[in-house]
């Protein structure tokens, strides 16, 4: 009896599977790093694990051998809470990947918005916002208006941020 040793096949560059990183959301990172000195007012940043919009920034020079420090004041994009952070300008901070999408309101069901994209895909996991915006959406829906809802998503959270009348065809 002969013994066979099977050699492991290693794919060549041409045989390797092409992976498309541009497509869908699966595996897409929720944040990306950016140097503090590159952050800008009205941009986004993660502070204490929350996605925030920068409302104020200032840079302070420190002593002879220190680094310039960046002071950031930002508001949580989902609950409006104020956060502050101080970091050396050369340090990296996480920036959330923030996506804005518009949907047509189809229905309001048990505190959730039933939404539809322009290609007919439905989405029903966005909560009816509380307060003034929620009232505006409910009243407009009850009046039979065609409403377009702006939904912002970042770091696995979503919120309805605005509503407007759909353009009449």
UniProtKB/Swiss-Prot annotation:
<dbReference type="GO" id="GO:0043022">
    <property type="term" value="F:ribosome binding"/>
</dbReference>
<comment type="similarity">
    <text>Belongs to the eIF-5A family.</text>
</comment>
<keyword id="KW-0963">Cytoplasm</keyword>
<dbReference type="InterPro" id="IPR020189">
    <property type="entry name" value="Transl_elong_IF5A_C"/>
</dbReference>
<protein>
    <recommendedName>
        <fullName>Eukaryotic translation initiation factor 5A-2</fullName>
    </recommendedName>
</protein>
<comment type="function">
    <text>Translation factor that promotes translation elongation and termination, particularly upon ribosome stalling at specific amino acid sequence contexts. Binds between the exit (E) and peptidyl (P) site of the ribosome and promotes rescue of stalled ribosome: specifically required for efficient translation of polyproline-containing peptides as well as other motifs that stall the ribosome. Acts as a ribosome quality control (RQC) cofactor by joining the RQC complex to facilitate peptidyl transfer during CAT tailing step.</text>
</comment>
<dbReference type="GO" id="GO:0008079">
    <property type="term" value="F:translation termination factor activity"/>
</dbReference>
<dbReference type="InterPro" id="IPR014722">
    <property type="entry name" value="Rib_uL2_dom2"/>
</dbReference>
<dbReference type="GO" id="GO:0032991">
    <property type="term" value="C:protein-containing complex"/>
</dbReference>
<dbReference type="GO" id="GO:0005634">
    <property type="term" value="C:nucleus"/>
</dbReference>
<keyword id="KW-0385">Hypusine</keyword>
<dbReference type="GO" id="GO:0002184">
    <property type="term" value="P:cytoplasmic translational termination"/>
</dbReference>
<keyword id="KW-0648">Protein biosynthesis</keyword>
<keyword id="KW-0694">RNA-binding</keyword>
<dbReference type="GO" id="GO:0002182">
    <property type="term" value="P:cytoplasmic translational elongation"/>
</dbReference>
<keyword id="KW-0539">Nucleus</keyword>
<dbReference type="InterPro" id="IPR008991">
    <property type="entry name" value="Translation_prot_SH3-like_sf"/>
</dbReference>
<dbReference type="GO" id="GO:0005829">
    <property type="term" value="C:cytosol"/>
</dbReference>
<dbReference type="InterPro" id="IPR048670">
    <property type="entry name" value="IF5A-like_N"/>
</dbReference>
<dbReference type="InterPro" id="IPR019769">
    <property type="entry name" value="Trans_elong_IF5A_hypusine_site"/>
</dbReference>
<dbReference type="InterPro" id="IPR012340">
    <property type="entry name" value="NA-bd_OB-fold"/>
</dbReference>
<dbReference type="GO" id="GO:0003746">
    <property type="term" value="F:translation elongation factor activity"/>
</dbReference>
<dbReference type="GO" id="GO:0006414">
    <property type="term" value="P:translational elongation"/>
</dbReference>
<dbReference type="Pfam" id="PF21485">
    <property type="entry name" value="IF5A-like_N"/>
</dbReference>
<keyword id="KW-0251">Elongation factor</keyword>
<feature type="modified residue" description="Hypusine">
    <location>
        <position position="64"/>
    </location>
</feature>
<dbReference type="InterPro" id="IPR001884">
    <property type="entry name" value="IF5A-like"/>
</dbReference>
<dbReference type="GO" id="GO:0045901">
    <property type="term" value="P:positive regulation of translational elongation"/>
</dbReference>
<dbReference type="GO" id="GO:0003723">
    <property type="term" value="F:RNA binding"/>
</dbReference>
<dbReference type="Pfam" id="PF01287">
    <property type="entry name" value="eIF-5a"/>
</dbReference>
<dbReference type="GO" id="GO:0045905">
    <property type="term" value="P:positive regulation of translational termination"/>
</dbReference>
């Amino acid at each position: 009896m002969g013994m066979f040793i099977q050699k492991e096949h290693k794919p060549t560059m041409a045989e390797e599977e092409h992976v498309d990183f541009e497509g869908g959301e699966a595996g897409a990172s929720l944040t990306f790093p950016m140097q503090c000195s590159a952050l800008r007012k009205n941009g986004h940043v993660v502070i204490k694990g929350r996605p925030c919009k920068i409302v104020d920034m200032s840079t302070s020079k420190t002593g002879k051998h220190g680094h310039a420090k960046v002071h950031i004041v930002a508001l949580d994009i989902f609950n409006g809470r104020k956060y502050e952070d101080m970091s050396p300008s050369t340090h990296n901070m996480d920036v959330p990947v923030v996506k804005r999408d518009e949907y047509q309101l189809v229905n309001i069901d048990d505190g959730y918005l039933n939404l539809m994209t322009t290609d007919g895909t439905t989405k029903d996991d966005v909560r009816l916002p509380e307060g003034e915006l929620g009232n505006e959406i409910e009243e407009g829906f009850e009046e039979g208006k065609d409403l377009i809802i702006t939904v912002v998503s970042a770091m696995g959270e979503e919120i309805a941020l605005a509503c407007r009348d759909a353009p009449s065809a």
